[in-house]
Amino acid sequence: MFKSIELNTVAVGIGLVFSYPIFILIIELFRGKNIKLLQVALIFIGFFGLYLLLDFSTISSALGVVYGLVSAISLAILIIYGSSKSVQFGGLNVAFVQVFFAAIILSPFTYEGFSWMLDNFLVSMFLGFFLTGVGLTTYWYVIKFIPPVSIGTITYLEPVTGVIIGAMILNESLRVSQYVGFAIVLLIGIAQVIFDTKNQVQSSEN
């Protein structure tokens, strides 16, 4: 994801990575899962809202697009595989294992930036605690109760929230189409929660 952002822009990188719900849908269909048509519609309408919100016109690197799509596919596989492990071992354990091995694998590539981390220790602690610690633990805990396809739709709200908060903090102006995209993603997120709630009620009755 970060390589995709480096070669293009933050908006393009985030938009490509958050196409992963579509890949979750494709993988689940190949696995023979029975996915309702409404769920398919929610995923694609949600991505359309994300498309309106993010600026894809700034794509400048085809390789960056490839990196973004590879990241999306790997994230889809991680969520599908990790959902069962989260139920089995708990969200906190799954988050710890994920971060532990990620740190080992990335350490050779980030050795030169170690001095920056020490010089900006409080910033590093903040990012590590909130973005990685709280974020991943909460995510893997929630996925115990919500199917991977549904969690993908709801997480469309993450880049949307980032754009809106960024606009508020940095005083960036948003286009009308971006507000429309924000409204679509927000409504899709609410619809997904209602859809999952009804399914859980029907399952408990049966």
Predicted regions and their residues:
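Membrane-interface helix termini and inter-helical loops of multi-pass transporters
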Residues: 3-6, 51-63, 107-125, 167-177
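C-terminal-most transmembrane helix of multi-pass membrane proteins
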Residues: 122, 156-206
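Hydrophobic/small/kink-forming positions within alpha-helical transmembrane segments
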Residues: 21-26, 73-76, 107, 128-133, ...
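Transmembrane alpha-helical segments that form core, pore/gating elements
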Residues: 24-26, 53, 57-113, 206
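C-terminal transmembrane-helix exit sites in multi-pass transporters
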Residues: 1-3, 20-41, 160-180
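Helix-helix packing/entry segments at the starts of transmembrane helices
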Residues: 13-19, 81-101, 132-168
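Hydrophobic transmembrane alpha-helices of multi-pass small-molecule transport proteins
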Residues: 35-55, 106, 165, 177-196
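Loop-to-transmembrane-helix transition segments
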Residues: 1, 41-45, 63-72, 116-134, ...
